[in-house]
Amino acid sequence: MPRTSRKRSETGFYHVILRGNGKQNLFETDKDRAAFMEAARSSFSRDSVTLIAWCLMDNHVHLIIDDPLDRISTAIQRVASTYAMYFNHTFGHSGHVFEGRYGSVPIIDDEQLLAAVKYVHNNPLKGMGITPDRYPWCSYSEYTSCLLYTSPSPRD
């Protein structure tokens, strides 16, 4: 049975989730997390995708992206394959790093966008009991102090 097509976002905004294969950790060190963010930044820049919010947990990743040109598949595939090559080389593994297809939820309006960003930023609290302001691997601090990986959307 063929799998269903992804739902396209009319707004261009998506909540993307990538999970480690077999619930394995995607990140062992901060160097691994930085490598993932570099892969995301490079791919998104190449595909005109803007990273709005993000959170890197040990075994999964949340990304809120603005993709007005509908390049989500190419962009996420490039991020995942670039990081998988890094991960497998670094840890002497082979095979899949991510579990199946990435998940994506189209965001339909500003209210849902705000809720998705809040959900992503609160993931460390929910998963590890760490408040977003104390967790360095989510974009919360970028919103409060203008740092690091995300950039303003060209639509701003």
Language-model regions, residue ranges each:
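Short acidic (Asp/Glu) and glycine-rich catalytic loops that position anionic groups and cofactors
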Residues: 17, 96, 148
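Active-site catalytic microenvironments for nucleophilic, acid-base chemistry
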Residues: 42, 86, 153
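Basic nucleic-acid-binding interfaces
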Residues: 67-69, 74-145
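Alpha-helix boundary/capping residues
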Residues: 40-43, 123, 147
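Conserved small/polar residues in nucleotide/adenosyl-binding loops
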Residues: 149-156
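An N-terminal domain-cap segment
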Residues: 2-13, 17-58, 64-66
